[in-house]
Amino acid sequence: MLYTPRFIYSNLTAGQFVGGEETKAGLAGAADISLFYEQDFDARGLNNSTLRAGLCISNMGNKMSYSSGTLRRDFLPTNLKLGLGYEMDFDGYNKLTVNGEINKLLVPTNPIYATDSMGRIIYNEAGDPVIESGRNPDVSVPMGMIQSFYDAPGGFREEMREIIWSLGAEYSYRNLFFVRLGYFHESQYKGNRQFLSVGAGIKYSVFGIDVSYLVATKQYHPLANTLRFTLNFDFVSANKNEIKQQGRLR
């Protein structure tokens, strides 16, 4: 289990006036909670196999505002992530790992407000907008996290659309050469990010380089044809090598 606190300072507006009101930097305190489980076990036809599972709730914190003159405060993008992976070691040289992951924002979904014949929002006697479908999003942070599982105006179907899921597979040879394939899916009604990714990687000693290419499944997608390069340095392996060298010198 891992607990990670953080302090957030966000100065997006740099003191500009919006709607006649001066903006300010947003401040918030937040934290992440992570759980990880790993279990090795024997499987027929395999040298070894490993099952991994993880859970992370990130950005749990107080609401943030960019204006001192308004009572409106916005939720941080609190997110729930669940992951499951299975690694198959065939002979000590060839490995195949399959992973799955789902993500869901733990913030209230905006309701549908009642409107009149002119399309104007209807307000009740207290001055609050009348909600036609969904639930009131003006709740506390803990209540907002709980409410996010059942407050969508479209009911259960819309709640399912709010879940982002992804799948991935990696083949490795002697932990030196890697080939990867993945798919990311977000509902067309909740952002419409959908793409395939292919990649490869090479590791030499404590250094590694990875390259990936995004193939969008929709035309005119902003992420289409994105090429990424990543350079890695393994500090743990570097320390182990240094300890071994010191032992030999002695």
Predicted features along the sequence, with ranges:
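Outer-membrane beta-barrel porins/channels
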Residues: 1-250
